């Protein structure tokens, strides 16, 4: 579930169904399905599926979800200007940070002098990073190079925030034993013909994640646009389609529920809207093993004035 409010300057927003750039934004919720896979590994527990130890409910971190979104955007927008990814594998962050200095013609050793000559240097650097990196524009970032240089742009708060995903019902992770015919060493090959291993699975689980989009922050800080928002929805719906692996082969986003407000700061608290969304087991189902075992509903009759519900 996401909350989005509308900003007067959402960049180049096209009209859809009578809405314009001045429209508000929505809250949204996503339903995430896991079938015989590991949705999120817990390094503190031997890489078993992450759970709340007191209740048994499954958890997936916001960091995991944002990683999937970043990977999707990088895949579909490969090489396209303005859609680079700041947090990525094998790329030191300060290398990307230095690009802003190069663009503005600033030597890293002379940042203090540049600050004296340019009062708005912080804003220029922030705008450069937001313009070029989609994930900074979306989620914000802590850019340590600028923090160390005592620039105010080192910490950017993004308009999009995600919560942990939590399973609708408690989960029962299973550890299964597997064998392989390949032997690791020649010495082992003389003693045995196979090797044993273990892996964790979750037979089935439906997870619910909630998130927020602030049009106010998008307008005032990062320039997150309507086109960026549409790409975010596309990424949430399809992020597992470009991330298949033996551990994640049947994971999918089942539905995205959006609460759209007609004012920039919103017409109702997010929690009241999220409470309108129910995911419940169907009558007679004791052990869910498919999405059809659940009924997902929204009490649209209870929507506050100025809030629209969109189901994707």
Labelled PLM ranges:
Residues 22, 26-312:
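RNA-binding basic/glycine-rich loop and surface signature characteristic of RAMP-family CRISPR effectors
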Residues 7-8, 82:
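Low-complexity, intrinsically disordered short peptide segments enriched in small/polar/basic residues
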Residues 5-7, 20, 24:
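Short linear motifs in low-complexity or flexible loops
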Residues 10-14:
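Hydrophobic alpha-helical signal/anchor motif
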